[in-house]
Curated annotation (Swiss-Prot):
This is Endoglucanase 1. Gene3D superfamilies: 2.60.40.290, Glycosidases. The keyword Transcription regulation does not apply. Residues 398-450 are annotated as: Disordered. The lineage of its organism: Bacteria, Bacillati, Bacillota, Clostridia, Lachnospirales. Its EC number is 3.2.1.4. SMART domains: CBD_II. It comes from Butyrivibrio fibrisolvens.
């Protein structure tokens, strides 16, 4: 063989090999950085996300279980494409939540996930990873009226634990080499399906059924987390999101809910959903189409709640679903987005993820609460770009491209919380009056109530004539930890209609205020914030005794 021919053949082979390698689709799965970022760092970097709703979470009829082909398009949406994810990234979103209903495909008593499902989910995850985006991967409609692969009650606890251990072991193994950009979410809106309190319950006085459900949800979060950690690799320190009952603010604020124990430090994130204000954002029967100042109360209360129990204790929060249904009121939804995301931007450890189900057109009355399309998945055009640009101005100042037009950058907001004394939460998430009387914008600060011992009580009165709120702070000024505390207020001075973050009892002529389990202990210099709300009139000061 002539040397020149040999060289030519070698060159030809190498060229062909090069062309072949270059033809292989590049999928960036970064494991180099591992999962060495804390939950606070990850959530701070996430900031704003978008849901691929009604896609991989779509499910078919239970009589066809187990499905042997994907139901991704079963609810009428097109299959997710990389082009769609590219457009979402261009608009400024850096987080994608991928809801997946795994159970409908599982086989055997050990709930095996078929390869065709896992491969497709991985493909969509990689669409996001190559865009340098965060991904939230969850177990979605595995509890509903058609499928109940888990149920939060003691009667179904054993099989539910088995389900979570199995699917999360499989999912975690498949993605164990992905870096911190992949976040797992144990469950979506776990609840008692069909129960009278499926979607709401009084947080300070839950029924026995709800108490049992909350305890089971705590257990399922722990089982799922343990299964993920046991797979090792990057999963040993991967960030994991966990919800409370129905992922609502009531579900995480009720006294029985707790974050799971974790072998990794600082890797847990609270998952909560908030379509608020409810009458504006989600309601279909009684609803309002205008977002005015009176509706800001629900949003303020929501963040103040989160701050009191989680954010102030260095537990970051992802609002995994939020949106306001399209009631043919784009200008009002722009106001809503401006206030909601502006409020979130005060906290460095909160990320917001917009729900999108690809349904846009409402009826003529605007009464449908499920119209949450922001980008048309067929045309890849944003439907109400002014809403998206309004959201982005509160994120990080990075220019975004929406429908081919670059949106100018804005000054980055200060992520530091500016409201250390939170406005209270209305314990009823479905208020009778959608236009509540606003709180006096100029509240009356009152000097601290002098007390003996280690604790000091401070309060501020918000008085609007027909009602009032008293925001109370109890602080430990001693050098020792205080376990348990009690406050008393005379009934002659206040009439308490509702409260938040505390328990209220009556004793003769006094209201007796005691803490929840999670805020009963105060370290030196620590404090706890809570409040009471009443109707009628109130003076300029009240006498609070601390015991």
């Amino acid at each position: 063989m002539h040397k020149s021919k040999c060289i030519k053949r070698v060159f030809t082979f190498l060229l062909a090999l090069f062309v072949f390698v270059m033809a292989i689709p590049a999928t960036k799965v970064s494991a180099a950085g591992g999962t060495d970022r804390s939950a606070t760092q990850v959530v701070s970097d996430m900031r704003v996300g978008w849901n691929i709703g009604n896609s991989l979470d779509s499910f078919g009829q239970s009589y066809n279980f187990p499905y042997t082909s994907l139901n991704e398009t079963y609810w009428g949406n097109p299959a997710t494409t990389k082009a769609l994810i590219d457009e979402v990234a261009k608009a400024g979103f850096n987080t994608i939540r991928i809801p997946v209903s795994w159970g409908q495909y599982t086989t055997g008593s050990d709930y095996q996930i078929p390869d065709f499902v896992m491969n497709r989910v991985k493909e969509v995850v990689d669409y996001c990873i190559v865009n340098d985006m965060y991904v939230i991967l969850n177990s979605h409609h595995d509890i509903n009226s058609d499928y109940c692969f888990y149920v939060p009650n003691n009667a179904n606890k054993d099989r539910s634990e088995k389900y979570f251990k199995s699917i999360w072991t499989q999912i975690a193994k498949e993605f164990k080499n992905y870096d911190y950009h992949l976040v797992f979410e144990t469950m979506n809106e776990p609840r008692l399906v069909g129960h009278g309190e499926e979607w709401w319950f009084p947080r300070n006085n839950p029924s026995n059924d709800i108490r049992e459900a909350v305890a089971c949800i705590n257990d399922y979060n722990q089982v799922a987390l343990d299964a993920i950690r046991a797979t090792g690799g990057n999963n040993a320190t991967r960030c994991v999101m966990v919800p409370g009952y129905d992922a609502s603010i009531e579900g995480c604020m009720t006294d029985g809910f707790k974050m799971p124990n974790d072998t990794a430090s600082g890797r847990l994130i609270l998952s909560v959903h908030a379509y608020i204000p409810y009458y504006f954002a989600l309601a279909s029967d009684t609803y309002v189409t205008r977002f005015d100042d009176n509706l800001k109360y629900d949003i303020d209360s929501f963040f103040n709640d989160l701050n009191s129990k989680f954010l102030s204790r260095n537990i970051p929060v992802v609002v995994g679903e939020t949106s306001a249904t399209n009631r043919n009121n784009t200008a009002e939804r722009v106001k809503w987005a401006d206030y909601y995301w502006g409020r979130a931007a005060r906290y460095s450890n909160v990320a917001m993820v917009l729900w999108d189900n690809n349904i846009y057109q409402n009826n003529s009355a605007g009464s449908d609460g499920e119209c949450h399309m922001y980008i048309d998945r067929n045309s890849l055009q944003w439907k109400d770009p002014e809403i998206i640009s309004t959201i982005m101005k509160h994120v990080d100042g990075t220019p975004a491209t929406i429908n081919g037009k670059e949106i100018p950058s804005t000054e980055q907001p200060d992520p530091t919380p500016v409201d250390p004394d939170p406005t209270p939460v209305d314990p009823d998430p479905t208020p009778v009056d959608p236009d509540p009387t606003p709180v006096d914008p100029d509240p009356q600060p009152v000097d601290p109530t002098p007390v003996s011992g280690a604790l000091k009580a401070e309060y501020t009165i918000n008085n609007w004539g027909s009602g009032y709120q008293v925001l109370i702070k109890v602080k430990n000024d001693s050098a020792s930890r205080v376990d348990g505390w009690t406050l008393k207020i005379s009934k002659s001075e206040v009439k308490i209609d509702s409260s938040w973050c505390v328990n209220i009892a009556e004793e003769g002529g006094y209201y007796v205020i005691t803490p929840m389990s999670w805020n009963s202990s105060l370290e030196p210099s620590a404090s706890v914030d809570f409040g009471i709300q009443g109707s009628g009139s109130i003076g300029t000061s009240v006498n609070i005794s601390v015991q």
